[in-house]
Amino acid sequence: MSDGIGYYSRRASHVVQVGGVPMGGDNPIRVQSMTNTVTMDTEACVAQVLRIAEAGGEYVRLTTQGVREAENMRLIREGVRKAGCKVPLVADVHFNPRVADVAALYCEKVRINPGNYVDAARQFKHLEYTDEEYAAELQKIEARLVPFLQICREHHTAVRIGVNHGSLSDRIMSRYGDTPEGIVESCMEFLRICMKHDFLNVVISIKASNTVVMVQSVRLLVQQMEKEHMTFPLHLGVTEAGEGEDGRIKSAVGIGALLTEGIGDTIRVSLSEAPEREIPVAKKLVESIGECARLRHEAEQHIADDTVTLRLCETDWESLQLKAAMAAGALLIDGKAHQLIIHNEGFDEERLVALADNILQAARVKFTKTEYISCPGCGRTLYDLEGTIRRIKAAIEREQRRLACIAEREPARLEETKAATAHLKGLKIAIMGCIVNGPGEMADADYGYVGAARGKVSLYRKKECIERNIPEEEAVEKLMELIDRYEKK
């Protein structure tokens, strides 16, 4: 974080003890990842935890979809410790608070999701509550949460209250709408209970695949915590960021916007790739905070003609991608400019223009290509997520190439082919491993490909499920047919 003296000041937070690796306070910003192995496969989980730790991951999260998986965390932890690795393990819990109770016995931290901890899973139904009825719902949450906090207190287990935009409850959505205020209140309800019962070993996160929603919501959360005299440390991440260059840029735009403002105590770069590949990217973001805070400040001072201009001196392409996205992200998200120019000797102008376009798209300023929202996968994913993403991207690219060839061979059909591909620019396709955030993220996507059962997929258009339980080997073709059916009407 060098080269940023005078431009970067970190938000004050209290220390949360996660095993032997504390976060918050004056501790370094921690980097972490999550396994994508089946939690009942102890050997595979141990091996992947060790790979993540060897890459530099400081916490490793595993999905615990049931009590059986939570119980198996004991064996996974034993295997990791026998290998001489002390990395803290985190259980990821949705839908069943009993699972969190069990996981707290064996893990250094447990993540719970306010959207489905006590509230029913999201059904996109509008619910009417009187103030008294709403207060009664909060009492139900408190009655269930307090015994869990007591277990955590007795076993020195930390808690992450992790809100996902894609899994807000119908209760929250009905009262606050699909807004940053609703996302923040979903978190604050739980934090107030923790404060009331003097349980402070809590880290919090607010994540979304939409970088604008994520940044605005985290900023609002920080403001609300300050009003209520809370100093909980923050975990940052852009959920379902994708893979490859797009995933890295989107993560750098969202996470970097906040890091350069001094917000964030631990980060995860969620990529639809092998989880150990997330760690070097996360480390680069942390190491670049000071420099990017300076670049952001200088770029803001020289905005002209609605354009952010960045001047960098990188020799490594990935470092250039990440630093440019970090430095420009907040300026674009906040609407201070709507164009971006990047200067960096050693890379040709065409490549730099494409990078600028990708950053503009990640900041949701200008859409020049199809956007893919894809989760990193976890033990809940029952199909080949990474391979599917490649096949869907390839299918879209084949269609674009086919129409481009027609235009080249038959110039008279140029306007026809432009019209035929116009819908692919800015089209949002969500490729989700399971039902936790899948249906919720459909609200921000045009089409969705969501894991249903082992080897089976459901296809969505917006919030509506169009086809259920399609065999995996047929699903990509069916998705393309669905897009063709609706987009060419």
Summary of predicted features, one role per range:
Residues N36, G56-V80, P114-A136, V202-T211:
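Glycine-rich, proline-tolerant flexible connector loops at the mouths of alpha/beta enzymes
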Residues E58-R61, C107-Q123, E261-E276, K336-E349, ...:
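Glycine-rich phosphate-binding active-site loops on the catalytic face of alpha/beta enzymes
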Residues M1-S33, L149, R153-H155, E291-D305, ...:
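N-terminal amphipathic alpha-helix/helix-capping segment at the start of soluble metabolic enzymes
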Residues E108-R144, R171-E181, E467-N469:
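Glycine-rich tight-turn/loop motif centered on a GG-T
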Residues V31, D92, I161, I204, ...:
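Conserved, mostly hydrophobic/aromatic
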Residues E128-I141, M173-E410, K428-A430:
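Catalytic alpha/beta core domains of metabolic enzymes, predominantly
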